[in-house]
Amino acid sequence: MKASIYLVTVFILLLLLLPTAIPHDYSDALRKSILFFEGQRSGRLPKQQRMAWRRNSALNDGKNLKTDLVGGYYDAGDNVKFHFPMAFTATMLAWSSVDFGRYMSQHDFRHNLVAVKWATDYLLKTVSQLPNRIFVHVGEVQPDHDCWERPEDMDTPRTAFALDAPYPASDLAGEIAAALAAASIAFKQANPKYSAILLNKAVQTFQYADSHRGSYTDNPGIKQAVCPFYCSVNGYKDELLWGAAWLRRATGEDSYLRYLVDNGQAFGESSNYFEFGWDNKVGGVNVLVAKEVLQNNVTAIAAYKDTAEKMMCSFLPETNGPHMSYTPGGLIYKPGSTQLQNTAALSFLLLTYADYLSTSSQQLNCGNLKFQPDSLRRIVKRQVDYVLGDNPMKLSYMIGYGERYPGLIHHRGSSIPSVTVHPAAFGCIAGWNIFSSPNPNPNILIGAVIGGPDVDDRFIGGRTNASETEPTTYINAPFVGVFAYFKSNPNFS
């Protein structure tokens, strides 16, 4: 008897000594991923501002063109406002509300709509002079990057750039149309009047995009101002499909369905379909359009669903190639950009397609193999947990989440003492002394998901390593919907 008790005791002690995975708090991650956007705000901040170390900035934007371009978001760790990636950010935040809002608490859903509206209020300004003019971005990149200044102090030129008709801007206008259309769905119940304004302007903006075909960076002046940061490398045709797809979903009108049918092949819905991000919308177009095929059997656009299926199958190693690549630690890997930018956008598509399969009671068909929607969700779960700390570096790549996350991130406002504790301005050159400091950023940019590790799961860090430590709005935005799903399904495995 004593021997049996002894063995049981030893067994229990051994179990206690075994390493156990600490479950992640997806609710906390969701809340913080939305809060991050308050740290990126430009313009006059509201009384409800929760990221308290930020203050008003860039209150004269647009003045050189005699227009109001105050507001919007800084795209990353600098103080420039690029409208192309900002519009993509708005689209993804709105899509998170539309398809994953049911997984959010009322509190989180409301704050996500606030984040969407901060972007769309500004985007409405960028297309306020259509069909004659569209505003492209605000701030001169080189002078801005030559200085290390918090937004509240910046004294670099705030030149606003615009394109006048007939110069083309199909990619920029197409993405803005998509953002406004997606947001119109998100606000349909909460604010019907605002929803109608967004949809009306989305229709007008898409008409402009389709009437003046070409990329916004085809213009030499804009190319010099924007490139190499946000050049439209992939061209404009994917944004036309993207805008049409969102307008089809927002309106249900057959004219947008015909547009997708007539232009899908010519505009490349079946090419380069492994990509999705601020520049290339092909993967997103196919998944978004596939919803109607899966749920309503709209066979006229079945080609989009077939291409979306090819993309989904590429994530599963059991299928015939081609395949997506993964790091040794399990992170989705694509060469040529910050890794978590790809992880965020592709994870969102995987989870969204899984949702469309589930609601239509269908499986993923990969040749002779069939997969349940949960096969895709497991891939996403691995990505999310990796980002939150289950990775070879044992490091959370979300700032302010968990016990261990990078302290020196490439972000001007976060790295320089706040005006609340140091009212005197930091000049252009003085800021570089702070940039070189080994001390952690004094202002925690809560919820920011940074660039992340390399192909071998290594992370060096430091403010000088912008590809690893700089956050962007378009990394965070897709993660909002992803975190919302796992908040409501925390025990999924």
Swiss-Prot record:
Sites of glycosylation? 297, 465
GO:BP terms for this protein? cell wall organization; cellulose catabolic process
Q: Which family does it belong to?
A: Belongs to the glycosyl hydrolase 9 (cellulase E) family.
This protein's UniProt keywords: Carbohydrate metabolism, Cell wall biogenesis/degradation, Cellulose degradation, Glycoprotein, Glycosidase, Hydrolase, Polysaccharide degradation, Secreted, Signal
A single Gene Ontology CC annotation of this entry is: extracellular region
Which Pfam family, an example, fits this chain? Glyco_hydro_9
**EC number of this enzyme:** 3.2.1.4
* The keyword Glycoprotein is annotated on this UniProt entry: yes
Catalytic residue positions: 78, 410, 470
Q: What protein am I looking at?
A: Endoglucanase 23
| Top EC class of this enzyme | hydrolase
Q: Which reaction does it catalyse?
A: Endohydrolysis of (1->4)-beta-D-glucosidic linkages in cellulose, lichenin and cereal beta-D-glucans
Q: Which SUPFAM superfamilies match?
A: Six-hairpin glycosidases
Q: Where in the cell is it found?
A: Secreted
What range does the record give for the signal peptide?
A: 1-23
Record-level Gene Ontology MF annotations = cellulase activity
